[in-house]
Amino acid sequence: VCSSDLAVARGVTVGVLLEVNESGETSKSGCNPAYAIRIAQKIGTLDGLELQGLMTIGAHVSDETAIRRGFEHLRRTRDRILASGEPGTQSCRELSMGMTGDMELAIAEGSTIVRVGTAIFGERAFI
């Protein structure tokens, strides 16, 4: 079932973030960065969905330059989506990037949403 169809059937508009796999790591989800603009423009045409922004998880490396590069690329991608002027893309303003370990880098690169679970709840206990 398409989420767009479900939202329309319920008479609601659902805000969505498009996840982009900026690190290219196979352990992470998200679309290929090369397709992010086209996918965002497609989402912008779907009834019942409002593209509110993009999200990514930073590269799992110790090299801060590499981490920042992914965040910077996502910000530039968001800016290109907004500049495209395509219908339904003007609401794409949020950048959800950065977690406890890299939130300062993400904020420096323009993040508007950070996910700080470990800083609040501590390390996960894996069973």
Segment roles from a protein language model:
Residues 1-3:
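Short, small-residue-biased leader/transition segments that mark boundaries at the very start
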Residues 22-127:
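Active-site loop/helix belt of alpha/beta enzymes
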